[in-house]
Each structure stands twice: as C-alpha cells, then as structure tokens.
Amino acid sequence: MRLSRLILPLIALSALAGCATNAPAPTANVAAPGPAPAPMPGYDWFLNRDGPEAILAYGVANSDEVKLHLRCKAGSGALELTAASEKPGREIHLESGGDTERYPAASEPAGVHDGELLTALAKSKDPVFQRFRRLGWIASWSDDERHIYAAHPAAKAGIEQFFIVCG
C-alpha cells in the first residue's frame, strides 16, 4: 500500500520537473548590416549656421544645386525639410538604414531650376533622422527611385553638429 501512495506524488513531481526545464533560447537570424553607400563625387553635406538657425544641405558646394535641405532653430527639435523634385508631389519620403518616414509636403515651382521644391515639417528625434545621424547617409524616394545622399568622411562631424544644435 505504501508504494501505491508514493507513485502518484512521484509521477506528479516528475511531470512538474519536466515542465520546468528550459528549452534552448531561439537564435536570432539577423543578417549583418550591409556596407554604407558610397559618397557621390562632387556632392556632400554642408552645415551652415546663421544666428540661432542651423542649415544642413546636401548638394554641390557653392551652387544652387541642392537635393535635400534641413533647417532648424537651435534647441527646437523641429525641422523644416526642402527636397528638390522633378514634378509636383505631396510627400517627402526619406529612408536611412531601414528606418523610413513619409512627411506630408507642399509643392511649389523651384524658380532657380526646372522642377519643384517640396517642403515639409519633421522632428529631429524621428527615427529616420537619428539613423541618418549615426550612419551619415539618408535616401529620398521619388517616383519609385531611390536617391542616396551619403556624406564624405569629413562631413560627418557637421551632421552630428547639426543635430546637437537642433536638439
């Protein structure tokens, strides 16, 4: 009789012990990030300070050829975006290192060159800008075409300074 009384608790105990064992943790199947896009010869990011305002522009030095323009007032955290476009649009679509954002935009004729200028508002803390800050490149999507704006090594300090100033 004693043995039958012990069998039931032993079975229950071994069942509990089986439930308590840890299964091996699943391994993450994360691919290593690809290499950063190469900077385009003749184009780069340029930082300009004018009083409390900071401007970060991607284009050709000392010219009107600017592809993307970010502006902020010091400490505001608010960005005004201006992007060159071949035709009128309703959004500025940006990507950096897998983070993407679409900003509703106003469109107006460029005046200085053929095409349009799209303007939108954003926040410097948006993930796409924080990734740009870390990686040194951002891409603009227009008509299913990706235009990459990668910094040359010397310009990366200006990108960091811009985001420090903007807050």
PLM features: residue spans?
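Bacterial N-terminal signal peptides that target proteins for export
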Residues: 1-8
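C-terminal motif of bacterial Sec signal peptides marking the signal peptidase cleavage site
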Residues: 15-18
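Extended low-complexity, serine/threonine- and proline-enriched intrinsically disordered segments
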Residues: 90-102
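Post-signal peptide N-terminal segment of mature Sec-exported envelope proteins
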Residues: 28-51
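Bacterial lipoprotein signal-peptidase II cleavage site
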Residues: 20-28
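Short, surface-exposed binding/anchoring microloops in extracellular/periplasmic proteins
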Residues: 59-90
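Generic recognition of long tandem-repeat/solenoid scaffolds
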Residues: 52-61, 79-83, 116-122
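Internal interaction segment
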Residues: 21-22, 100-167
